[in-house]
């Protein structure tokens, strides 16, 4: 099955509103194993809508259209659909009954303009709307099946899940889809591509793609086959090959994140953590405490942004700050040791750096970050030289901190 998505609305075309409907539909179709080669966006113009529908009908056998079914003058999708189908636009009894029922349910008198939402091509079949006023409709034109849905996301999703997707699934014309995602960091797309050359060799049903989601890269393996057993077998083989090649670069798989992986490792090992943050301003602590249950292992987090805070709260010697500077290996280690002694945690991680845009120098440019990890037996420090704006430096620093904790916990017996 080849499907296409057509989004209608001047607000989408002009970039005033982000088209979340298209991404939602695309994800649902992907999971259903439907091939989606085309997406289009057109404005609120009848002829443009008709021509877009004709184009998509020639390249696909299913088109999902969203937007333009409202009660206002710029909602012209039903008119365009009638012109496309060569069918008169007329009041639909089922849609009229829905409008009446909706008004009674919400105890609200609808404006006469809402009657426009009952107008549909005579050849159309109604798609019920359980949460709004605008019913959708489906029709067949030139051998292609069209589904017209409202643009309001909550209404669109309900109708998509309740009516459209079941109809597509029951057609039996979709493939069996299997996918696997490996999340890696510290390596470029080009390097990944070179490493994984030939990983799908011998499996025509398998493909591999890369998606950058700073500061990580997702390696996506997709298998599309006619039979479930075939798809399961291929994804297992190609997935294992990919995992073995990438090795320790993989920090998470599928729906996991670095945050959830670290949380799971703390729970598994029983270790506890405290933090001392300067340049990240509490971002690492936020990422940890965003997950429920973090109180079981996260004891304390201090944002010691100023030198005075480092001295008063962490016991960093004033002389050390004067001699080495706040952004230094020595101060990072002193911060980590101070956090661990103060909290009594098993591990304490500290970060100090220059997030920018000011504050850098030739010796310590913007993006310079010192990170220290103190444990029972030793305190280690690392120097990072990150690139990007202030937000990116803080984000990648928090990621690097979590990744260090991940590696540390994995090494524990």
Curated annotation (Swiss-Prot):
SMART domains assigned to the protein according to its UniProt record, in alphabetical order: MoCF_biosynth
Superkingdom per UniProt: Bacteria
Gene3D superfamilies assigned: CinA-like, MoaB/Mog-like domain
SUPFAM superfamilies hit by this protein: CinA-like (SSF142433), Molybdenum cofactor biosynthesis proteins (SSF53218)
UniProt-listed PANTHER family: NICOTINAMIDE-NUCLEOTIDE AMIDOHYDROLASE PNCC, NMN AMIDOHYDROLASE-LIKE PROTEIN YFAY
Family recorded in the similarity comment: Belongs to the CinA family.
Name of this chain's protein: CinA-like protein
Species classification: Bacteria, Pseudomonadati, Thermodesulfobacteriota, Desulfuromonadia, Geobacterales
């Amino acid at each position: 099955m080849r499907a296409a998505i057509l989004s209608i609305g001047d607000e989408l075309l002009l970039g005033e509103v982000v088209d979340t409907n298209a991404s939602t539909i695309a994800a649902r179709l992907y999971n259903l194993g439907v091939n989606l080669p085309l997406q289009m966006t057109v404005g609120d113009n009848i002829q443009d809508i008709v021509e877009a529908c004709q184009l998509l009908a020639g390249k696909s056998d299913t088109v999902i259209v969203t937007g333009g079914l409202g009660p206002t003058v710029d909602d012209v999708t039903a008119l365009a659909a009638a012109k496309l189908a060569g069918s008169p636009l007329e009041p639909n009894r089922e849609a009229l009954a829905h409008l009446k029922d909706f008004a009674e349910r919400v105890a609200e008198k609808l404006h006469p303009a809402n009657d426009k939402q009952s107008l549909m091509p005579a050849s159309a079949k109604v798609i019920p709307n359980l949460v709004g006023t605008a019913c959708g409709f489906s029709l067949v034109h030139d051998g292609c099946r069209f589904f017209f849905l409202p643009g309001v996301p909550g209404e669109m999703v309900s109708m998509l899940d309740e009516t459209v997707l079941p109809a597509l699934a029951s057609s039996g014309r979709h493939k069996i889809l299997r996918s696997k995602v490996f999340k890696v960091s510290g390596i470029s797309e080009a390097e990944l591509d070179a490493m994984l050359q030939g990983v799908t060799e011998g499996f025509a049903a398998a493909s591999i793609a890369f998606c950058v989601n700073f500061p990580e890269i997702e390696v996506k393996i997709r298998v599309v086959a006619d039979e479930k057993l075939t798809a399961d077998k291929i994804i297992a083989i190609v997935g294992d090959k990919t995992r073995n090649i990438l090795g320790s670069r993989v920090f998470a798989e599928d729906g996991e994140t670095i945050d959830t992986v670290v949380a799971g490792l703390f729970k598994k090992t029983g270790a506890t953590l405290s933090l001392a943050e300067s340049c990240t301003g509490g971002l690492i602590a936020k990422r940890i405490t965003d997950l429920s249950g973090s109180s079981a292992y996260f004891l304390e987090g201090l944002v010691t942004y100023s030198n005075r805070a480092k001295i008063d709260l962490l016991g960093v010697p004033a002389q050390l700050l004067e001699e080495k500077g706040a952004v230094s290996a020595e101060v990072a280690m002193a911060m980590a040791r101070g956090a661990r002694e103060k909290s009594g945690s098993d591990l304490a991680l500290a970060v100090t750096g220059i997030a920018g845009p000011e504050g850098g120098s030739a010796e310590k440019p913007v993006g310079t970050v010192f990170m220290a990890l103190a444990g029972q037996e030793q305190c280690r420090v690392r120097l990072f030289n990150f690139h990007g704006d202030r937000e990116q430096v803080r984000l990648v620093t928090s990621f690097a901190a979590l990744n260090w904790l991940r590696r540390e916990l994995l090494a524990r017996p």
